[in-house]
Amino acid sequence: NWISPEEIELVEGKKVLKSNNSIEVKVGPIESMSKSKKNTIDPEKIINNYGADAVRLFILSDSPPEKDIQWSEEGIASSSKFIQKLWTLHSKILDAVDKNYNKDSGENLVKFTHKFLKKITDNLNNFSYNVIIASIHEMYSFFSKEIENEYTSDTLKENYTKILISIMPVIPHFANECLNLLNIKKNIKWPEYNVALLEENFVNIVVQ
């Protein structure tokens, strides 16, 4: 017989029935969700616990769309923690926008933004959502370091806004709230990347 996870508890390192601790439960391999197997998930409960964006982020990041995902509440919790990191980063960016530094031309930021936009646009068209999630992690790492460079307010706000718009299909609630906090509420259009800014500038140095 199939047993619901809610009917099981851990006692002295063993998984047993809550109703009768003398009966040990055998855990089988991962199965597809089915009411008869009592392994379905209540989406409302998960969304209430972690938020819709975290659930969406987990589902899209787990595997390519043509493959089945392996449901994991630990995975959703990890996605939720990452979104919290994005919120912390957003607060730092808002603070930098308000202070309006003027020490960096923003060349690295502009180039990164347009490369990011190309990645997101191309992978949305290819339904490669897991690649998009990886790009969002790269964006987080980039901004976490670059925020110290003290860009001008306009440069930082303009490029960060483009990035927020581009990630709306993946984490819409987060992106929309961030745009509202930046007072961007009208005429939101999909950002286009500049091909000229995708090129890397290399200098050949003769070694003697």
Regions found by a protein language model. Name each.
Residues 43-208:
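Helix-rich, typically C-terminal accessory recognition domains appended to large enzymatic cores
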